[in-house]
């Protein structure tokens, strides 16, 4: 039996690293297609590329073989080559590049904050408010349109070719670091690192409330909310609904009514930090979709309400920033590590909370 992730109840996306955000502004297209195959008990031995080719519509055998060569086909959790002999009750997971886009991506002169660039890749610092990739309703003004302009004189880079370009995504209103592959080989090698979870990324977030512990671990399956397709919701770890997700957090600074934290993802699910923090009662400050624009902690005085309104105006998006990014260079094999300072809106928001808390004493834990 074969199921695409789109066909599985509440189980739309395998990895937030490699797929689109559920934000409508991000569009519906994914960077990769993900499949899971559960082999029947009576299956006779056969090469896995032939087995998959016979069961997958609109996929060539060459496309499947390329996925195997890249390490994107796993059987029972381990990578296999295209000549692997399928056995009864095997569980196969695979990731395939999507075909070329139906809509042409046009180069647009949009400023880019380039942190690093060489012949194989570039690392950019994405501002909040910039959609990563063209999609339904957003075919212009995206990060990929900007990259297409920046690389318009590079003959080998075609922004419409899924074998180059984005390796992972962050939401429209999340700021921070992203890596872009300029060659097919670079994208394959980088994609494998994300697929195998050997990259390192950390986020800074301001959340509502005073977290009890200085550090913690949140575990809970993440799936689309059946009542709101633009939200994700959390189910118990032993649930058959959703995909396993683990978030580690560490407190950086406390402001009584809010807390600045660092988050490291053990998995990469859609809206993982946003959904997990909401789940434990500490949604991200300013995150309208997950309840973070309400006054959830603190006084009810008019001055306090005015302070919160000012903060929400100062940073009118979820207070989340992709601060660090680490991976092995696909050509040199060198470890590459990057850090991005908090953008002005988040830095100013943190400053306002410091000033507020320093002017108030006797604040209780909330």
Question: Which residues fall in each region the model found?
Answer:
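RNA pseudouridine synthases
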Residues: 1-366
